[in-house]
A protein has these predicted regions:
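Extended alpha-helical scaffold segments
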Residues: 2-77
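Alpha-solenoid helical repeat scaffolds
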Residues: 37, 75-79, 119-123, 162-169, ...
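Eukaryote-specific, cytoplasm-facing alpha-helical/coiled-coil scaffolding segments in long proteins
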Residues: 28, 96, 117-124, 140, ...
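Eukaryotic acidic, Ser/Thr-rich intrinsically disordered low-complexity regions
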Residues: 332-367
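Helix-rich alpha-solenoid scaffolding regions
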Residues: 2-26, 34, 99, 103-169
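HEAT-repeat alpha-solenoid elements in large eukaryotic scaffold proteins
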Residues: 21-30, 57-76, 91, 107-120, ...
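Core helices of alpha-solenoid repeat scaffolds
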Residues: 1-5, 39-51, 84-93, 127-137, ...
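Short coil/turn segments at helix-helix junctions and helix-capping linkers
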Residues: 14-22, 52-63, 94-109, 140-155, ...
Length: 367
């Protein structure tokens, strides 16, 4: 089991390639069978083995073991199987030790170990040992590195997001760790030079936008749907419009500014434009649409003017490609819906002119 964990971990000191595929597949299937049938004595023996190999700085002499350890945790503690308090404490020390290495691979490996701990440990153990705070403070330092790969960026922010569930005194009204993350994410998106990284960061901004909602799982499912289908977009739009977006109130102006700054990337390739625009659409649905216009109207005229102009420029640059035209039309429909949905209230005077303008654009695009 220990050997298979080292061989199948990626990357490892053995550089075990993914071909022939039958070999790696057989190894993984065998490993899954033996890890799920582990009993107490086997677990104790494995724990003792890793304790000897990965104690303090000794992990640097056992590179295979440290990669194998992360693989073992992922396979051994899955589903309803939770880590013991002893394994939780040991995994924390291993994660902290490997992250002292300057190599980004080991910082990412440490974040992976932390994420496995946060997902597969007893919440009571995590909170009593204050594990989540230690991990958050350690990993948040990586959030300032804007040159990471998409994989490393995803590992960092996934780990930080998992920490939030264990802060029992956190609420949506007071400034909290969620706000610190949004501050850094918005900053990183604005200075990101790669579309793929921007898309990755935007997804986490969107997730934080509905973190405090009671129907978080429902919103997760709706946002994961294919929103190019009108009926699914309608369900998603209605659900997002009813969100209680107290956190987004504080960030609405900066999120709108971020979307305008990012819109320049929409003029790149058709594929990049489509993916980024769809992610912007989800972000707008969650973070901006639920906010009452009376609280938002001071920021919207500038956003409408600049952002819609870029959307129209996209159509010209990409020669009205259907994969670009569809999300552009959807965005314009959402902006129009936002204005029309305030019909029960008096529409702010500085927004009244945009209602007819957006309707005209929608009709023009439909031709």
């Amino acid at each position: 089991m220990l050997l298979l964990c080292e061989l199948t971990a990626s990357p490892t000191v053995y550089q075990f390639k993914l071909g022939p595929e039958s070999l790696i597949q057989n190894a993984l299937e065998l490993l899954e069978r033996v890890t799920t049938s582990c009993q107490g004595p086997v677990d104790a023996h494995i724990f003792k083995y890793y304790e000897e190999k990965l104690h303090k700085k000794s992990w640097k002499r056992h590179i295979g073991a440290v990669h194998g350890f992360a693989e073992y945790l992922q396979l051994r503690y899955a589903g309803d199987i939770k880590m013991s308090a002893q394994m939780l404490a040991f995994s924390l020390s291993v994660g902290l030790n490997v992250r002292e290495c300057y190599d980004a691979v080991y910082k990412q490996l440490g974040a992976r170990i932390f994420s496995l701990m946060l997902k597969q440990s007893n919440p009571k153990d995590i909170q009593e040992m204050n594990v989540h705070s230690v991990i958050y403070d350690q990993v948040f330092k990586d959030a300032y590195n804007t040159t990471e790969s998409v994989e490393a960026t995803t590992a960092t922010w996934t780990c930080l997001y998992l920490c939030l569930d264990h802060y029992t005194d956190m609420d949506r009204f007071a400034w909290n760790q969620c706000d610190d993350m949004l501050d850094r994410l918005i900053h990183n998106v604005s200075i990101s030079s790669h579309v793929t990284n921007s898309i990755c960061l935007l997804r986490f901004i969107t997730k934080l936008g509905y973190y405090f909602t009671i129907n978080r799982n429902e919103i997760d499912s709706l946002l994961a749907m294919d929103l190019t289908q009108p009926d699914k977009m309608l369900f998603c739009r209605e659900a997002c419009n009813s969100l209680n977006a107290c956190t987004s109130f504080r960030w609405s102006k900066r999120i709108l500014q971020m979307l305008v700054l990012e819109s320049d990337k929409l003029l790149q390739s058709v594929d990049a434009c489509t993916k980024l625009l769809n992610e912007m659409l989800r972000c707008y649905l969650v973070c901006i649409l639920p906010i009452p216009l009376q609280a938002l109207h001071h920021h919207l005229p500038e956003f409408y003017t600049k952002f819609v102009a870029i959307l129209l420029e996209c159509l010209v640059v990409h020669e009205r490609n259907i994969s670009v035209a569809q999300p552009v039309l959807q965005f314009i429909e959402i902006l129009q819906f936002q204005l029309d949905s305030s019909a029960s209230q008096k529409l702010p005077t500085d927004l009244q002119e945009y209602t007819n303008a957006l309707q005209s654009l929608k009709l023009l695009m439909a031709q």
